[in-house]
């Protein structure tokens, strides 16, 4: 274990809820539909988060719980049945329908598991129903994907075939690139979870080796282990360093010589480091403060310090799974301050006291900080953008160099007018 400084903090939080994950999950599985059982606030959140990204009829919606539902004066189950029947009659192409719980549905104890069971019997052979919680009562927004994948694990058939399973949503082009690299390394049976079609779930078993692409899938990992899968612990594939070690860990699990891995990835790494240079010129020596929201913070801190030369003031993370993050923690400087959890007022006080050059935070905090003259980067962009892999290292760095470059340009223009 690294000697980083680990701290815990509790108090008021400022994060999105797990419903936000629907935005990238519904892009990943175009044959699925996500039906949020929640309030009008839930509907507004999803529409706002996804509205700018939808270029066709969306594959998500909200079954609205009215005030009389929340007060127990109406049967929410009847209304949900009506919405589902109407939806399936209008959208016969739906193969999997996710019933997504929310804060309101959990408050009134709406049993979506029982609802899903009944609907599976009614629509047997036509539509598969799966339920999970996207509530933000005790979770952050990326855990919505964890809940969705965990709900799918029991539906995955068993196999003894040896395979590498990449777990966590990736952009399709990044997934294709990863599979191609692994094929060159010598691993030919590579599958992804979630798959591109919700009905084509990979089979798993004792010879399935799981390599995570995202750090926020603790519950999914636990269930995959219970199914007999072997978990490969590695840094996450962000940047040249993390991606290289990730490929090496995957190869080692299949007893492939690391010289073969280096032979395949060395040309990619050299090109990526050259592409990084224009960004490191801007980022090197700049002070970075990461507020907790996505659970990507530790991996991002490692990349931005080790490969881009940024100075880490504080690395916040909503939750810290030490088993999954140990390899990442070992790559951080020993004096790195990591804070698990959040007391948003205290953290904002520390931001103001340390005057960072860049703060990675949620959208709700970005505008107030910008108004105080502090450059920010939305953490949710890291989930919506294709940032994984050696080839994407420069694009990842660019997400952080651009706000600093913009600030430099604005500052120079302001000075020129005086």
Swiss-Prot record:
It comes from the Bacteria. Its cofactor is [4Fe-4S] cluster. Its EC number is 1.3.7.7. It holds the Pfam family Oxidored_nitro. It catalyses: chlorophyllide a + oxidized 2[4Fe-4S]-[ferredoxin] + 2 ADP + 2 phosphate = protochlorophyllide a + reduced 2[4Fe-4S]-[ferredoxin] + 2 ATP + 2 H2O. InterPro entries: LIPOR_BchN/ChlN, Nase/OxRdtase_comp1, Protochl_reductN. GO terms for molecular function: 4 iron, 4 sulfur cluster binding; ATP binding; metal ion binding; oxidoreductase activity, acting on iron-sulfur proteins as donors; oxidoreductase activity, acting on the CH-CH group of donors, iron-sulfur protein as acceptor. Keywords: 4Fe-4S, ATP-binding, Chlorophyll biosynthesis, Iron, Iron-sulfur, Metal-binding, Nucleotide-binding, Oxidoreductase, Photosynthesis. [4Fe-4S] cluster binds at residues 17, 42, 103. Component of the dark-operative protochlorophyllide reductase (DPOR) that uses Mg-ATP and reduced ferredoxin to reduce ring D of protochlorophyllide (Pchlide) to form chlorophyllide a (Chlide). This reaction is light-independent. The NB-protein (ChlN-ChlB) is the catalytic component of the complex. This is Light-independent protochlorophyllide reductase subunit N. It comes from Prochlorococcus marinus (strain MIT 9312).
């Amino acid at each position: 274990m690294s000697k980083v400084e680990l701290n815990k903090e509790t108090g008021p939080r400022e994060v999105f809820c797990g419903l936000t994950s629907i935005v990238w999950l519904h892009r990943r599985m175009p044959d699925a539909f996500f039906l949020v059982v929640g309030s009008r606030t839930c509907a507004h959140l999803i529409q706002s988060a996804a509205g700018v990204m939808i270029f066709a009829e969306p594959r998500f919606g909200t079954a609205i719980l009215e005030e009389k539902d929340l007060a127990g004066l109406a049967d929410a189950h009847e209304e949900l049945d009506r919405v589902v029947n109407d939806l399936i009659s209008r959208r016969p192409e739906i193969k999997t329908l996710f019933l997504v719980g929310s804060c309101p549905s959990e408050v009134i104890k709406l049993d979506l598991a029982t609802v899903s069971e009944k609907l599976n019997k009614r629509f047997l052979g036509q539509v598969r129903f799966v339920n999970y919680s996207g509530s933000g009562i005790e979770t952050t927004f990326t855990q919505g994907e964890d809940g969705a994948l965990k709900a799918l694990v029991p539906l995955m058939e068993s196999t003894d075939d040896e395979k590498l399973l990449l777990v966590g949503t990736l952009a399709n082009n990044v997934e294709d690139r990863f599979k191609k690299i692994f094929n060159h390394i010598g691993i030919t049976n590579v599958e992804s979870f979630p798959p591109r079609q919700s009905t084509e779930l990979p089979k798993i078993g004792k010879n399935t080796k799981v390599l995570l692409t995202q750090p926020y899938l603790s519950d999914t990992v636990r269930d995959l282990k219970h199914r007999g899968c072997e978990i490969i612990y590695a840094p996450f594939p962000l940047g040249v360093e993390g991606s290289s070690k990730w490929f090496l860990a995957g190869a080692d699990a299949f007893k492939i010589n690391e010289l073969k891995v280096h032979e395949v990835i060395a040309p990619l790494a050299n090109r990526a480091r050259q592409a990084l240079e224009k960004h490191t010129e801007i980022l090197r020596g700049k002070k970075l403060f990461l507020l907790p929201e996505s659970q990507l913070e530790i991996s991002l801190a490692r990349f931005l310090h080790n490969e881009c030369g940024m100075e880490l003031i504080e690395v916040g993370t909503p939750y810290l799974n030490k088993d999954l993050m140990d390899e990442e923690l070992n790559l951080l400087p020993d004096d790195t301050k990591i804070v698990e959890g959040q007391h948003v007022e205290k953290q904002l006080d520390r931001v103001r006291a340390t005057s960072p050059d860049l703060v990675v935070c949620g959208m709700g905090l970005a505008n107030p900080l910008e108004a105080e003259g502090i450059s920010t980067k939305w953490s949710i962009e890291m989930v919506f953008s294709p940032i994984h892999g050696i080839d994407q290292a420069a694009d990842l760095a660019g997400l952080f160099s651009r706000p600093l470059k913009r600030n430099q340009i604005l500052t120079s223009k302001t000075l020129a007018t005086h």
